[in-house]
């Protein structure tokens, strides 16, 4: 089910607070480290760089016009695919 049209997009309050602080100081080159993968990327974040935590490291996400409206977690994968298991060769004796 999609989100109700009446509700605004969800963005964690601490993410908004950190972004507003960086915007007010005009230091757009600083990386804002966040854990909130479920927060929606807003228009005011364009030009900022966020470090989205994937459980191990902070993955840098540069916000552009193309990714506004999507969630931070989409750009920080939590699992690494190592490939499917190969066929095990059965060794026969004798």
Swiss-Prot record:
The keyword Ribonucleoprotein applies. It comes from Anaplasma phagocytophilum (strain HZ). Keywords: Ribonucleoprotein, Ribosomal protein, RNA-binding, rRNA-binding. Belongs to the universal ribosomal protein uS19 family. The keyword RNA-binding applies. This is Small ribosomal subunit protein uS19. One of its GO terms (biological process) is translation. It comes from the Bacteria. Protein S19 forms a complex with S13 that binds strongly to the 16S ribosomal RNA. The lineage of its organism: Bacteria, Pseudomonadati, Pseudomonadota, Alphaproteobacteria, Rickettsiales. GO terms for cellular component: cytoplasm; small ribosomal subunit. One of its GO terms (molecular function) is structural constituent of ribosome.
